[in-house]
């Protein structure tokens, strides 16, 4: 089973930069995107052979997620069932016969960590949501988690310790998530591989210099880790400030 996840930083913009070519080339069983920045009816993208599911933020031009799946889900729903978290189009859950597929766009803590307190609440509530699902059947959770977990996961750890995405608080929450029975599929297969980044700032020629961060993940229920066959970072694929990532499951 081939799965792809990509923070497209605006799907309409990304479609103009080769999104559909990559979509067709990869021919994934399930392809999910984050940060669509869309409202309903603003794009005509309905790939043949796929069912399409969208979750839009209430605020225009902000956040949003989508899933395109060849596999027919038993059930699909948006959000995590908590009003304070469900207005920004951040989560779509698809239930299949033997697993849950949950795509997420985790809230950014923002400059000066304005949203860090909210982020901490989100982390706890979202983790509990995943744990409840995991009691029923294994979970595959791809998305932009807006955290580089360890120093190996970004080019310049020392200068970023107080910046959104690498605060100790955010890193500890990711550790807590893994401790709740989940694995970071990429690190499971590549425990010591440095220079594996998925996001680069548009400033300072960061992508050219490969001064990146790994903040996009496929998190998988621990009991399914043996099924992880390959975890891919499509580093050379342009179109967004993130690159796509892939997961091959047995």
PLM ranges: what are they?
Residues 1-9, 98-110, 142:
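Active-site-proximal beta-strand elements of phosphoester/diester hydrolases
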Residues 1-47, 51, 57, 62, ...:
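N-terminal, active-site-proximal structural segment of metallo-dependent hydrolase catalytic domains
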Residues 7, 23-41, 101, 130-151, ...:
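Active-site beta-strand/loop signature of hydrolases that rely on acidic residues for catalysis
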Residues 30, 51, 125-211, 215:
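Metal-dependent phosphoesterases centered on the DNase I-like endonuclease/exonuclease/phosphatase
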Residues 37, 42-109:
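Structured beta-strand-rich core segments of catalytic domains in phosphoester-bond hydrolases
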Residues 60-75, 204-226:
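Conserved beta strand-loop-helix elements of the APE1-like EEP
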Residues 70, 94-97, 221-222, 247-250:
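Active-site beta-strand termini and strand-to-loop segments that position acidic
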Residues 81-82, 107-123, 158-162:
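Surface-exposed cleft-lining segments at the edges of enzyme active sites
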């Amino acid at each position: 089973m081939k799965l792809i996840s990509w923070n497209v930083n605006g799907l309409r913009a990304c479609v103009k930069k080769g999104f559909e070519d990559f979509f067709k080339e990869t021919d994934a069983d399930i392809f999910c995107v984050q940060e669509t920045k869309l409202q309903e009816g603003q794009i005509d993208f309905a790939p043949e052979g796929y069912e399409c599911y969208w979750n839009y933020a209430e605020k225009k031009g902000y956040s949003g997620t989508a899933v395109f799946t060849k596999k027919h889900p038993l059930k699909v729903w948006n959000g995590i069932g908590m009003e304070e978290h469900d207005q920004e189009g951040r989560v779509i859950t698809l239930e299949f016969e033997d697993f849950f597929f949950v795509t997420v766009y985790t809230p950014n803590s923002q400059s000066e960590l304005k949203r860090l307190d909210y982020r901490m609440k989100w982390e706890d509530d979202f983790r509990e949501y995943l744990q409840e699902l995991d009691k029923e059947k294994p979970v595959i959770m791809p998305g932009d988690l807006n955290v580089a977990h360890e120093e190996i996961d970004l080019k310049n750890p020392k200068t970023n310790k107080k910046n959104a995405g690498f605060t100790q608080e955010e890193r500890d929450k990711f550790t807590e998530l893994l401790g709740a029975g989940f694995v970071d599929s990429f690190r499971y297969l590549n425990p010591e591989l440095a220079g594996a980044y998925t996001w680069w700032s548009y400033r300072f020629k960061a992508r050219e210099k490969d001064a990146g961060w790994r903040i996009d993940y496929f998190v998988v229920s621990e009991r399914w880790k043996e099924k992880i066959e390959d975890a891919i970072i499509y580093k050379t694929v342009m179109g967004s400030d993130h690159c796509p990532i892939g997961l091959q499951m047995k």
